[in-house]
Amino acid sequence: MIAQELSENQKLTTAMSEKSRAGYALRTFMSDEEFRAAASALVASSVQTQRIPVVMQLPSPLQMLYSTTRAVQPDLDYDFDDDDAENAAIYCADWLRTFNGTQIAGLIFDEREGEVAEEAYQPIKNIAEHYQWVIGVRRDNEVLFSSPKITIPVLPSMYWTSGEVTIKTSGAIFTEIARDAVPEQVLDFREKLS
């Protein structure tokens, strides 16, 4: 939804480009009321269709900073650091308040395109603690949660098309079902994991 909004919402990206200061595009994006309402409605309806706790995956604050800046200044070369990531986390934390009533159980921040210092997440940790959400970070082969301290292996999405298990699958795993997976085959492969 975030990528689609950045590529298709011309009115919003125009507003995001009004100032070139680092973080302005992200701040404008995260504070847009229409986007906030649409994101909240999508998450709320997704949670309501499940009978188990739902954890929402998002880009890391640093990745959000890169994505929003790239959306309005695609030809510039950027180099953001951990301080920029922490500033971005402030805007993200404010945006996350939108999901207060959605009944999500936690958040996973995708760091596959670049790790973020744990301290940079402090604004988000404060919000998560208030709402009693768990926080994890996704890396290439694992999802790491700090409180409680848990590491969950990532089952590659190719499993859902090949059936080949490349990791130990006892206990919890994290996975994404491949777009080209056949639904009946997915059900069979899911049974193999049990």
Go through the PLM ranges and name each one:
Residues M1-I2, L58-L62, E113-G114, N141-V143:
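Active-site-proximal loop/turn and secondary-structure-junction residues that shape catalytic pockets
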Residues S46, F99, A128, F189-R190:
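Generic structural signal for hydrophobic
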Residues M56, F109, E129-S146:
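Aromatic-lined carbohydrate-recognition surfaces of secreted/lumenal glycan-active proteins
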Residues V137-S194:
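Catalytic-face loop-and-helix region of soluble metabolic enzyme cores
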